[in-house]
Every structure is written in structure tokens, then in C-alpha cells.
From Swiss-Prot:
It comes from the Eukaryota. Residues 35-155 form the FZ domain. Expressed in adipose tissue, heart, brain, skeletal muscle, pancreas, thymus, prostate, testis, ovary, small intestine and colon. Highest levels in adipose tissue, small intestine and colon. Residues 1-24 form the signal peptide. It comes from Homo sapiens (Human). Its main location: secreted. The FZ domain is involved in binding with Wnt ligands. Keywords: Developmental protein, Differentiation, Disulfide bond, Secreted, Signal, Wnt signaling pathway. This is Secreted frizzled-related protein 2. PANTHER family: FRIZZLED (PTHR11309), SECRETED FRIZZLED-RELATED PROTEIN 2 (PTHR11309:SF45). The keyword Ligase does not apply. The gene is SFRP2. One of its GO terms (cellular component) is extracellular space. Disulfide bonds join C40-C103, C50-C96, C87-C125, C114-C152, C118-C142, C172-C245, C175-C247, C190-C295.
Length: 295
């Protein structure tokens, strides 16, 4: 679970809440790479961190000491936002080589990430983590991994076992920056069921979606249509299919947001999100539009 202010790892990414979950990963202390004999297990479809990796089987225990798939799933989700931040094209490869190390039937030895792979990812991603107050964890220090050889996972340029650099993920439709005029804003407000000014308390990932829990005392209601006060008391909004796209618009857990959306199947689904910046011309226009809203 991703916790509120002061602990987000890089939500759509990047904001303090995910790092709160990442802390759980660091509590294993120093990893011991001399594990008992590993077993090959199919990579589950709900291991979103390694979705699309080009091998089917992983070793348990893994290189982080997780002995059950439940542990892997609980800890891996916190790192998805770091991958989506695209601080390095091989971030997923590096993390998956630890969370879900490749398992080959004819090889008993666990294949670790190469030292150079770790160094490259650390050099690019550690500053991103540091910006949110979290240092690169000791358990991932690159000196723990072997120098480049045939029995370690190298950078994409020389590796054929794991996928090469992926295309940059698309921007989530709800998070696209649209330069709307007043009429466009009015139309957007009218076609949605709710418009709220919110602050985020907590964020979690469920399957392909993002569940956003609101700070109840920091919520301003601008419009409700078919949405009851009871619906809002749940203080839960959803950003659908968000693990397949990025949302840089929503990358600060401490910022207020204007969100609009629709009620779908009993859930409040976000269709538009904008960071609320007091005094910004666009939000003055939005405020005027809300005050004279007539749908």
C-alpha cells in the first residue's frame, strides 16, 4: 500500500507515496545470495512490474529473499512507478532480475544482474529517488553484483535474453494537458458526473488500475450529477488502465487537484485531472466556468 505525504516513490509517475511501500523491501536487510536450492515458478500475470518480460519462469526464493509469490507481489508493486518514470530504459530489467530472476531448466545457478547494469540504473534513478528523500538502498549496492560475464544479466545493448528498451509509455487520456477555452471547459464539466478539488491521502495499484483515496477534509465539491454523498463518503476514485500509461500531471502527493469523472459500475472513474495551481490563468478560467455552470 502506498502511503501519504513523505513517502511516495514516484507515482505516475513520481510522488512520495510509493516509497512508503518500497521501504518494506528494504527491511530484508542485506541480501544473501547463497540461497537454498531455488524452484522454477511461472511468472504470474498479476506481477505487473515484470509484465511483458521475455521469459516465462522465475526462481523462488528470488534475489531479494522473498520465498513466496505473495511476498514478491506485495513488494514488487511499489516499484512500478519508478519504471514508469523512465529514469533509465533498463530499470525494469534490473528490478525483474531481482524480483523475478530468470529460471532455466538446465542451469542451477541463479543469474544475477551484472555490475554494469546496476551501475547504469543506479546512476540515473538514484537521483530521482533522492529527490523524494530516499537514498539508493544498501541491499541494491552494485558492488554486490558480479562483473560482466556470461552468467549475469547485462545492459540491453548486449543482451538477447531479456527485452530491449521499450517504447516510452503513452500519456493517460485523463492526464493529457489540453489547452481548452471556456466553452471546452464548460462542455467537459457538463459531460461528467462529478467535479472535485481534492488532495490525495493514499494510492494503491489493483491489477491495471490506480485506486486513489482522498483526504476527506480537503475535498471541495463543484458538481454532482447522479453521484450521491454516500458515494463520496467512500473517498475513493479510480484511474483506469493507468499502469499502461503515465500521468505526469499527478506527480506530487502534496498538491491539490481538480478531478472530473463519471460514475461507472458503482465506481467513480477519473476522466480528467489537473494539478490545481492557485493564481494560474487556466484555473481562474475554470473557477469562472464553474460559477456560471449551466448544463
Amino acid at each position: 500500500m502506498l502511503q501519504g505525504p513523505g513517502s511516495l516513490l514516484l507515482l505516475f509517475l513520481a510522488s512520495h507515496c510509493c516509497l512508503g511501500s518500497a521501504r518494506g523491501l528494504f527491511l530484508f536487510g542485506q541480501p544473501d545470495f547463497s540461497y537454498k536450492r531455488s524452484n522454477c515458478k511461472p511468472i504470474p500475470a498479476n506481477l505487473q512490474l515484470c509484465h511483458g518480460i521475455e521469459y516465462q519462469n522465475m526462481r523462488l526464493p528470488n534475489l531479494l529473499g522473498h520465498e513466496t509469490m505473495k511476498e514478491v507481489l506485495e513488494q514488487a508493486g511499489a516499484w512500478i512507478p519508478l519504471v514508469m518514470k523512465q529514469c533509465h530504459p533498463d530499470t525494469k530489467k534490473f528490478l525483474c532480475s531481482l524480483f523475478a530472476p530468470v529460471c532455466l531448466d538446465d542451469l542451477d545457478e541463479t543469474i544475477q544482474p551484472c555490475h554494469s547494469l546496476c551501475v547504469q540504473v543506479k546512476d540515473r534513478c538514484a537521483p530521482v529517488m533522492s529527490a523524494f528523500g530516499f537514498p539508493w538502498p544498501d541491499m541494491l549496492e552494485c558492488d554486490r553484483f558480479p562483473q560482466d560475464n556470461d552468467l549475469c544479466i547485462p545492459l540491453a545493448s548486449s543482451d538477447h535474453l531479456l527485452p530491449a528498451t521499450e517504447e516510452a509509455p503513452k500519456v493517460c487520456e485523463a492526464c493529457k494537458n489540453k489547452n481548452d477555452d471556456d466553452n471546452d471547459i464548460m462542455e467537459t464539466l457538463c459531460k461528467n458526473d462529478f467535479a472535485l478539488k481534492i488532495k490525495v491521502k493514499e494510492i494503491t495499484y489493483i491489477n491495471r488500475d490506480t485506486k486513489i483515496i482522498l483526504e476527506t477534509k480537503s475535498k471541495t465539491i463543484y458538481k454532482l450529477n447522479g453521484v450521491s454523498e454516500r458515494d463520496l463518503k467512500k473517498s475513493v476514485l479510480w484511474l483506469k488502465d493507468s499502469l499502461q500509461c503515465t500521468c505526469e500531471e499527478m506527480n506530487d502527493i502534496n498538491a491539490p487537484y481538480l478531478v472530473m469523472g463519471q460514475k461507472q459500475g458503482g465506481e467513480l472513474v477519473i476522466t480528467s485531472v489537473k494539478r490545481w495551481q492557485k493564481g494560474q490563468r487556466e484555473f481562474k478560467r475554470i473557477s469562472r466556468s464553474i460559477r456560471k455552470l449551466q448544463c
